[in-house]
């Protein structure tokens, strides 16, 4: 692992780092915020997954999360959204290839060698962070925005013993039923719809059995989001949650769109949501 830069931030420490990944067969980058409390004890960690076209820097520089994270004592890790590099396959479209990893393990050529973001996020990166930084592995939460909201919910549902709290802003919750998901899943996973269901929040929730004892999932969604009706469809997820007893708090926010002004407005609510479970 290489630390590229470190900055004092609200009494804590924000670092940008990279390492050679075996999961994605390329260099991967991430940012990590350590609150002041991490100098004396292991602290809970919140994994933040960003959306289409983003890198590790978008949330880090735009969300305004670190003042409250320092107060609450939350470590925040923000990885890149995909493998990158000259040898990594790409696509001219913004919603495929580099910057559009969709937090799955691709099975189709030419994507399968590098696009293994599910394994990277759930296994390799947590092991690295636990070895190098003062995280409490028994207190982990996961959150994200848009494509990252899809990643946060699906990863949280598939690994409930690891991620104790889940939240999302403007998440893609039903990729089997939206153009972004259908395009990406066709390319990365092929035409076997059963494999698609493994990365669809609605499908996973419906198959989860009784979820009545799990903490509530917080979702914020702007009602002026240009992608709301065609791509995001949060009501589909609410119905899936109701069917298995999962508490979900979907908050429709009047006038807000899909961007980081929206994220920065509500990020503190999400940090408090996770801290209530983890801290």
Segments the model singles out, each with a brief description of its role:
Residues 1-279:
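Non-catalytic cap/lid and distal C-terminal segments of serine-dependent acyl enzymes
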